[in-house]
Amino acid sequence: MINESIKNFIESLAKYHAENVFNPWADTNPDYEIENAVILRRRQLETYLSRRLSTAKLLLIAEACGYQGGHFTGIAMTCERMILGYHKTVTPMMILGKEGTRTSRKDSLFIKKEIQREKGFNEPTDTVAWSACLEAGLGPDEFILWNIFPFHPYKKGCFLSNRTPTDEELSVGLDYTRQLLEITGTLPI
């Protein structure tokens, strides 16, 4: 069962909107994504957090959601190939306890690489983060991956790009991180 505080947290995330920022839990782009992408990403984040709520020992925080990772999965530092079972190290069972659902469109003319259309997006940072936690001896449900700016900042006019969050965006992100810590309780960061 999904914790009500997690649902409320995701609703809070969904309220954020800014220029040149994609919100995985509120926004969708039909050129790149399937129709019900927002609903799927919300469910995946709910499942991810609920599995870790009572077991997490660590909160690992990176900078921002990237276009090859959390943008399409709704989960920080977690790419589509991981939730679909195409990753060599991280399996869907480790993340969600079941196979996840991709939200990028296999038939998108805007996704240029055949491998991305076939197997979904793959983010190198995601592999590094997951591998580091697992190699440190943490079980997959003993850490929560998060971004200080949980949304995907992109360069103007270039949807599939990443940019560094502004100071204002980082400040907004800190508020969301505090909300997350209210749900999880105190965790080493």
Pin down the residues of each PLM region.
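A polyanion-binding, active-site-adjacent surface
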Residues: I2-P188
